[in-house]
Amino acid sequence: MLISQNWVTELLGRSNPDWKVSPAELDSGYVRVGFETEGYSAIPETTGPLVIGRVETIEELEGFKKPIRHCFVNVGDANGTGELQSIVCGARNFQEGSYVVVSLPGAVLPGNFAISARETYGRMSAGMICSAAELGLSDKQNSGIITLPNEIAEPGTDARSIVGLDDTVFDVNITPDRGYALSARGLTRELASAFNLKFVDPAVDLNVAGVDTSDVPESSGELIKVDLRPETQARRFGVRKVSGIDPKAPTPFWMQRELMLSGQRCVNAATDVTNFVMLLLGQPMHAFDANLIKGGLVVRNALEGESFETLDHVKRTLSAEDVVISDDTGIQSLAGVMGGTTSEISDETTDVFFEAANWHPITTARTSRRHKLSTEASRRFERGVDPEIIEVALDVACALLVSIAGGSVESARTLIGSAPSMPQIRMKTSRPAELAGVAYSDATVIARLKEVGCAVEVDGDDLLVTPPTWRPDMTMSADLVEEVLRLEGLEDIPTIVPLAPVGSGLSPAQLRRRAIGHALAYSGYAEILPTPFIRNDTFDVWGLAADDERRSVVTVQNPLDAEYGVLATTLLPSMLEAVTRNVSRGQTSVNLFGLQQVSFKRGSGISPMLDVRQRPSDNEVAELLNSLPVQPLHVATVGAGFMELEGPWGHGRTYSFADAIESARVVARAAGVELNVENVEMLPWHPGRCAALKAGDHIVGYAGELHPQIVEALNLPARTCAMELDVSALPLKESFPAPVLSAFPVLHQDLALVVDESVPAESVRKVIEDAAGELLEKVELFDVYRSEALGAEKKSLAFSLEFRAQDRTLTDDECSEGRLAAAGRAAELFGATMRA
């Protein structure tokens, strides 16, 4: 969150008038109470004469492409003569009598923009009337000329301190569990603890916030009929109305300044007020043009497919999980995220409905992510907003708008729902000291909990603590301990470095994982990290049966992307997306592998809450483990395009299903096991080009060419191949026997067998391996040949045989004997014939 130092010190200074702090000290204060700052920066320096001026006369110049005004501005004695200063300006948001900020010749503005006197548009311009952007207060170039309250200072007075150029902006990193700190109210509470200052809640004493609500009448009667439907899970909903405002009244500079320094865009008085209240109190609000609201309001779930145009002028198709605010004419707001164009504030708006609600955090987060629409409002509702602040926020917004744009506040108000009661937590007073190893007194523990906003009762050695409504993250005694330790100073907890146990090296499972990764990398595959999430409709696209094991997915309750809401049971979806992405960017050959855990649902998936103060029982541990998903380690390879690139060394070779199967064998060799393959049908693979990978009698994976329909549906290259194998299902070997080395040479012979097309090459290879005798050391398939001469439905399988003995040099006859024995056995089993 961006917040200026001057605003923080102003809010705390009203209760602590003698408190002064430097930017470095303030930065340390944030860190001391557990908030990291991304950094802080002073407003860019302006040198030279920068003064307050009063516009005395304005002459409209004609004949130019854009409106130009020639102004005479009273800058007192700052120009050395006391005469009116001639300045040409194109802005329209000031008039005669306006107090403005003037940079005179010799001034240098941020960006090294030097001001000098020069003739332009036929008039002498000796200076510049400045906008917020030109002074470094805003990065919005259309921020407009700064107009100050009348009689704010004598013309010619230095303007730097008046417009707040002596300020520093802090970027405070707010963690997801500390939503209350996304406001000046929350941050000043924390800083009061950091610097041991008196804290007065600006939501309780509005004088601290500098807001006078004396003109806001006590509520009486219902303002507008609201139907707050229970399925929306909204806790509270409130509306107040301001009538008869001046729609063109400018937002005062003091408010514009805080909005701009906090990264907000100034729009109009009503909208700026809602943003200011959000920054001050942490309650997001929305302003409707009351004359465009017809009938009552209904807070409901959207209809599936319902359309709505948000304020950013994007038409959005809504989900039935989205919550909307609608009237008799249709949707007016996407609850907790953004309003709509149908009732937005305009230059004709005279009556305003202010809406403040307490939306369900998870519903808001899902809507924001579903529509890729993260707003300042959604950020706060996702983290939790104080449900008790709604009445105060509505009154403050009404008071501010009336003070800026006139009008009156209607006495009627609509307020539905009530704040939920906070749980009372029991904690031993000594618990923080026990955990931290620091002797915290009982008084210290109680004082720190009260600083957070808790109500504390003493019950013997225990404390009964009720967290404040703005701290929904405090649900157990451990949360209370954390608050005490944080505010007392984590840096004061003694550091005791535990003795590190003697290292035992990598475990056998870790060694196997590393060996598999190295082996695949050496084989030409590039490793990627598959995402742990997959699309919700992945297995529908694949056409998997309803009872397929891969559909046993773990659903993520609060996904980062609503379309990727389940944990992966297979690595292939993520890897195939990577192939598509690489091919779309010009890669003609993509050979990837991934080595990662997948997750299969087991049991209810709901973990029991265990007592952290004692060792859980065996039954509790078993229950906990049974609630966790099964997470085996999988390895997958995907290949498309060339496996061997074309070059001076010869023609390239495209990736085929045989390469996918070979990648499985690479994995098996690295793991020290032997794989067998057999033909099967398994989606997403091609029914005729898929092999089951078996370790012993158990199927541990599949490899082959992907199904053409799936290739087309996923925009993959034709004949993309893939392999996936469950590494955890392979027997884990802690040692590998070294191969026996022979001093005698190896003899090579080839064997080509003609078999039916349906006979798997692996089956023939195994028969040769079994029948060729003990002298056979290695057998490999090196060629598959088909031709008309062989006959229809026939193929030739050529194998390379290596023979070697441990005690002598073999003769050709001995090798031929083994070769012929293998051919004979293949003839018996498959009807194979030797090819000349």
UniProtKB/Swiss-Prot annotation:
Q: Which SMART domains match?
A: B3_4, B5, FDX-ACB
The protein's Enzyme Commission number: 6.1.1.20
The B5 domain covers 420-495
**In Gene Ontology terms, what is a biological process of this protein?**
phenylalanyl-tRNA aminoacylation
InterPro entries per the record?
A: aa-tRNA-synth_II/BPL/LPL (IPR045864), B3/B4_tRNA-bd (IPR005146), DNA-bd_dom_put_sf (IPR009061), Fdx_antiC-bd (IPR005121), Fdx_antiC-bd_sf (IPR036690), NA-bd_OB-fold (IPR012340), Phe-tRNA-ligase_IIc_bsu (IPR045060), Phe-tRNA-ligase_IIc_bsu_bact (IPR004532)
On assembly, the entry states: Tetramer of two alpha and two beta subunits.
PANTHER family linked: PHENYLALANINE--TRNA LIGASE BETA SUBUNIT (PTHR10947:SF0), PHENYLALANYL-TRNA SYNTHETASE BETA CHAIN AND LEUCINE-RICH REPEAT-CONTAINING PROTEIN 47 (PTHR10947)
Name the chain's protein.
Phenylalanine--tRNA ligase beta subunit
